[in-house]
Amino acid sequence: MDEYTKIEKIGEGTYGVVYKGRHKATGQVVAMKKIRLENEEEGVPSTAIREISLLKELQHPNIVCLLDVLMQDSRLYLIFEFLSMDLKKYLDSIPSGQYIDTMLVKSYLYQILQGIVFCHSRRVLHRDLKPQNLLIDSKGVIKLADFGLARAFGIPVRVYTHEVVTLWYRAPEVLLGSVRYSTPVDVWSIGTIFAEIATKKPLFHGDSEIDQLFRIFRALGTPNNEVWPEVESLQDYKNSFPKWKGGSLSANVKNIDKDGLDLLAKMLIYDPAKRISARKALLHPYFDDLDKSSLPDNQIRN
């Protein structure tokens, strides 16, 4: 830790306090995440250190770069590149009645998908995507933060400050207790974030797991084995769930054109096996008029 100076505390993350800091030798400004572990006495689990070390290899222009992993007094510090604004703060700063330009919505979604394709191709899931861990710079670049931390540390039910971890972006298979979920959980989250970037409002803002599920069911219809094979055998599925029919997404989501709504519907398909993959989503006609040459990484690398 001697190489870094703490400048100020900038927030509370899911796993602990986040500081703005500076690398003494180079002057580079960084974000320093102090990881607070459930069992402090036991120190940092070796599995967590292994997982985190792998994340240093995730180098992509749409992923916040993990620069360093440091230990001090059995505390783990993760050192990331610094970006001063997250998507949630940005959406909150837009004056009432105004919205993000439609081309920027498209560009942000495309970049988020590029970052996720890169990680999924390396078998890394995010599992906890939300506007707070999408960071933006002044040049229109958006980057995904906190990749792989869910696997390394688990997702706590409450954040360090006792705020409840948000359920708004969580895929229905996770909410229904599936243990065998995979990359489609991130695509669902990105779909809900897409709607929020366009409308400035969360698409499904439940305040408990059941409220979250019911908000999804009201909008999309209550799923059954016909639309989603084996959903009725998931741990938390109840035959007593109200049988909502579901309406059209366009009623809930203004500011997205026909192609955008088609892509959104494909990202919010109940059956994870039928949900569009991030790689296929990048090829959707919604992005046909996006100038990809100006994006930070328009080559999808395997």
From Swiss-Prot:
Phosphorylation at Thr-14 or Tyr-15 inactivates the enzyme, while phosphorylation at Thr-161 activates it. The gene is cdk1-a. GO terms for molecular function: ATP binding; cyclin-dependent protein serine/threonine kinase activity; protein serine kinase activity; protein serine/threonine kinase activity; RNA polymerase II CTD heptapeptide repeat kinase activity. PANTHER family: CELL DIVISION PROTEIN KINASE, CYCLIN-DEPENDENT KINASE 1. Phosphorylation at Tyr-15 by wee1 and wee2 inhibits the protein kinase activity and acts negative regulator of entry into mitosis (G2 to M transition). The modification Phosphotyrosine is found at Y15. Residues 4-287 form the Protein kinase domain. Plays a key role in the control of the eukaryotic cell cycle by modulating the centrosome cycle as well as mitotic onset; promotes G2-M transition via association with multiple interphase cyclins. During G2 and early mitosis, CDC25A/B/C-mediated dephosphorylation activates CDK1/cyclin complexes which phosphorylate several substrates that trigger at least centrosome separation, Golgi dynamics, nuclear envelope breakdown and chromosome condensation. The modification Phosphothreonine is found at T14, T161. Keywords: ATP-binding, Cell cycle, Cell division, Kinase, Mitosis, Nucleotide-binding, Nucleus, Phosphoprotein, Serine/threonine-protein kinase, Transferase. One of its GO terms (biological process) is mitotic G2 DNA damage checkpoint signaling. This is Cyclin-dependent kinase 1-A. Belongs to the protein kinase superfamily. CMGC Ser/Thr protein kinase family. CDC2/CDKX subfamily. It comes from Xenopus laevis (African clawed frog). ATP binds at I10, G11, E12, G13, T14, Y15, G16, V17, V18, K33. It is an enzyme of class 2 (transferase). The active site is at D128 (proton acceptor). It catalyses: L-seryl-[protein] + ATP = O-phospho-L-seryl-[protein] + ADP + H(+); L-threonyl-[protein] + ATP = O-phospho-L-threonyl-[protein] + ADP + H(+); [DNA-directed RNA polymerase] + ATP = phospho-[DNA-directed RNA polymerase] + ADP + H(+). It comes from the Eukaryota. Its EC number is 2.7.11.22, 2.7.11.23. It holds the Pfam family Pkinase. The modification Phosphoserine is found at S277. Forms a stable but non-covalent complex with a regulatory subunit and with a cyclin. Interacts with spdya. It is found in: Nucleus. GO terms for cellular component: cytosol; nucleus. The keyword Phosphoprotein applies. InterPro entries: CDK, Kinase-like_dom_sf, Prot_kinase_dom, Protein_kinase_ATP_BS, Ser/Thr_kinase_AS.
